[in-house]
Regions:
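Conserved acidic
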Residues: 1-185
Length: 185
């Protein structure tokens, strides 16, 4: 399932194309709508783990320079770490907090995937996510464990082939077939 959250959605445009509702004395604001296709396929074209999985020795954690580790390096990492969500970010991140986690919402016996502003203990994530979270202001408190692996864009040719075949399709069956070939991986 997807993320469970309560958020406030508010956006108001103000530009010359709004005719009578346009307020020239205020800043011009445009709203954009994006209909993005093949998000799942696009992520599968990235560098993905494929082999030689091993845990990194505890004393080697100190030498890991995750922030400067290239996204397209031959070696990748999944980390178990503790993260602090500084209070100064709470207002800024309130509508879409980082680092989703499975928690029991108030008055519920069932865990949901939730976005919270809580600090995280033993949070498991890919090193690229950790780089993003730190760049956005979360603080890395401690690395508990690190899983190292070889990575490459090993699915890219398969995804690109099915995407091309889907674009060349001349009937609904083929269109759905090639879409399913990507989404079923």
């Amino acid at each position: 399932g997807g993320i469970t959250q309560c958020s406030t959605r508010y956006a108001k445009a103000n530009n010359k194309y709004m005719k009578d509702d346009y307020r020239p004395d205020l800043e011009s604001i445009y709203l954009m709508y994006f209909d993005v296709n093949s998000l799942y396929g696009a992520t599968m074209c990235e560098f993905l783990p494929y082999g030689e999985f091993s845990f990194v020795d505890d004393d080697a954690f100190e030498t890991l320079d995750i922030l400067n580790h290239p996204d397209d390096a031959e070696i990748g990492y999944i980390l178990d770490c503790d993260l602090n969500y500084p209070p100064n970010l709470h207002q800024l991140h309130n509508d879409l907090p980082l680092a989703p986690e499975h928690r029991n919402p108030p008055h519920s016996n069932f865990k949901k995937l939730m976005l919270t502003l809580y600090s995280k203990q033993n949070y498991v994530l890919h090193y690229r996510n950790l780089k993003l979270y730190i760049k956005q202001g979360l603080e890395l408190v401690k690395i508990n464990r690190v899983l190292k692996f070889r990575q490459s864009p090993w699915l890219k040719k398969y995804i690109d082939l099915n995407t091309q075949k889907r674009q060349e399709s001349s009937n609904e069956f083929e269109i759905h077939f090639y879409k399913l070939m990507v989404n079923s991986v």
